[in-house]
Amino acid sequence: MMRRVTSSLPSALKLGRSLGPNVRFSGGAAAVEASPAIPPNSSSGKTLVRNMKPRELMQELDNYIIGQTEAKKAVAVALRNRWRRHQVDAAIREEISPKNILMIGPTGVGKTEIARRLAKLVDAPFIKVEATKFTEVGFHGRDVESIIEDLYKASLTQTKQNIMRRHEETARQKAENRILKALAGVSDGFREHLRSGALDDIEVIVELQEKKEKPKNSGTNEGVFISLEIPSSIGGQRPQTVKKVMKIKDAIPAVLQEELDKIVDTEDVSAEALRACEEDGIVVIDEIDKIVTASGGYKGHQASAEGVQQDLLPLVEGTTVSTKGNVQIKTDKILFICSGAFHSVKPSDMLAELQGRLPIRVELKPLTKEDFHRIITEPRYNLIKQHVMMMKTEGVDLVFTDDALWEIASIAAHINSTVQNIGARRLITITEKVVEEVSFDGPDRKGETFVIDAAYVRNSVESMMKKVDIKKFIL
């Protein structure tokens, strides 16, 4: 239903304009208080790693990841070297290849988190894959060349977003003009009211291109779909359009997106995406130790594991991969970051050729009691702050004393050292147990202050600690 407002549209009437036939009112009235018609560019506040110095990138990662200075430094330098390579002469640029990285460390110390945070910062095509998802060519499953195809898809998406970001202001102007033309037949006078949101609840008839859903393959990525539909642009035909009655606040995003799509269609997206993929692409391969077999060990259960390593060799060294769309992608300038816990195998158990293609080796250290305390206090949106803010939604003021935080860190370190070391993930288990009662009773404790101290922490995890102690005596 349309929102009725007692005031009419004074600004438009004072201008002496007559609204066109494509406009509908709710009782001749319009909204006078609303959010801006077109949202500001949401990407404008994003700091891109391409323009960041290694120290600045380190500081950004420090907001989320505690310790592991060597790993963060290696990644920061590797990314800065991508920028440096673009600044040198073209003759030497072709000779400079990225120095691939191998991150080694127990589970839960920050390997995956470093990759995840990089994905949010980096202004380059980026994908993260699990090594266990791939099989040797000839076995059932995905082969490693699909990594490069996925990277190219990520590059296409990012390139389109970058083009849209560059031309967003132009598209915004065109979208406003289309709405104003449908609204009043003119684009003078009403633009400020449109931007202020004063016209948001007016219904207007807009003409949008009709979008047809493409048939999807069922279940698998195999096979090729051949479309027999003839594009409407052939033979000079205009794309099919459909008229829709929409509120202005709903029409503007749709029209803006259509204008952006038109701009993207005129740009050479494929060529720019291919260049970005080949020159700036970053691939993170996690759990690489899971495709490594101990020297002299039984290999029957991992028949294709060594084959996956063999298939990775040409990708990491540099080859040309042909995608399903017949796009030729060179991989010699793509940066590969591999990581693994290496609990049951050693890095030296990897194929010697693959070891040689990962020249920068970084060891992440196990977490100590002090590290655990820093993890739940220093990061911008640490685990404790998350629980506090969640309980605030129930009207409960949740307070952790300093000795409670140290107790949580101490228990996490103790359980990791006596049972199995799962790193920082242990903190999630403990804190969830600690806040279990207040989370359950939260709706009934509105307006209360709930204080958690060291004694409360010990009582909450007492049953967990007893199970840990018993396990030490069970063979």
Curated annotation (Swiss-Prot):
Family, as annotated: Belongs to the ClpX chaperone family. HslU subfamily.
Organelle targeting peptide span: 1-27
Purpose of the protein: ATPase subunit of a proteasome-like degradation complex; this subunit has chaperone activity. The binding of ATP and its subsequent hydrolysis by HslU are essential for unfolding of protein substrates subsequently hydrolyzed by HslV. HslU recognizes the N-terminal part of its protein substrates and unfolds these before they are guided to HslV for hydrolysis. The HslVU protease complex functions in mitochondrial DNA replication by regulating DNA helicase PIF2 protein levels.
InterPro entries (UniProt xref): AAA+_ATPase, ATP-dep_Clp_protease_ClpX, ATPase_AAA_core, Clp_ATPase_C, HslU, P-loop_NTPase
Gene Ontology CC, one term: kinetoplast
Molecular-function GO terms, alphabetical: ATP binding; ATP hydrolysis activity; peptidase activity
Species in which this protein is naturally found: Trypanosoma brucei brucei (strain 927/4 GUTat10.1)
Name this protein carries in UniProt: ATP-dependent protease ATPase subunit HslU1
Binding-site positions, ATP: I66, G108, V109, G110, K111, T112, E113, D286, E353, R425
